[in-house]
Amino acid sequence: MSDIVFIIGFNHDSNCYLINKNTLVDTGAGQNKDYLFSKLRENGVEPEDIELVVNTHCHFDHIGGNHFFPNAKIAVHKLDAIPIRNEDTLGTAGTAFGFEGVNNSRVDIELEEGDKIADFEVIHTPGHTKGGICLWDGENLISGDTIFAGGGVGRMDLGGDYQDMKSSVEKLMRLDVKNIYPGHGPTVENNGKDHIKLSYSYL
């Protein structure tokens, strides 16, 4: 199993996850650089040690800090690469929250279902956005804004779709998930599958 370090987000930031000291999942909204860097350093990692940034989807609160890591490759699902490259503030939800520019248009790697990142497999989970993904290693689910602790799911009014979300949660229900590492809020330990079932019951 990969080593996962939870970096809790605050204000507009998403949660971020450090994997194996060289991969960062999501980078927050880009407003708290000193905080993010301090958390990396607490775990013995310098910002320039990050070789890969994986964005779980294209919204500004998950991609806003991508430019903090100019030496890292930026990876996102191919469907969410489009609004990022186009600097589409509607598609990245920046407009909805008063952020008129995300300052992040670079995508180096277009991810697809089944791609591998360290010990994780990419699972395409549209619903919150067209190109939302989760990362799954047989025990741990880094869920982005698809699933949250307590049965929550990502909002579907900012480029999402209800039927896609329902299908994505159905897909996740087939996994024997132990721990959930969501895009916002607390993590789930030991009974992740129960939280996914609860999410489905709310849809």
Language-model segments: residues:
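Conserved beta-strand hairpin/beta-sheet module of binuclear metal-dependent hydrolase folds
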Residues: 1-42, 133-149
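Metallo-beta-lactamase
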Residues: 30-31, 121-124, 129-203
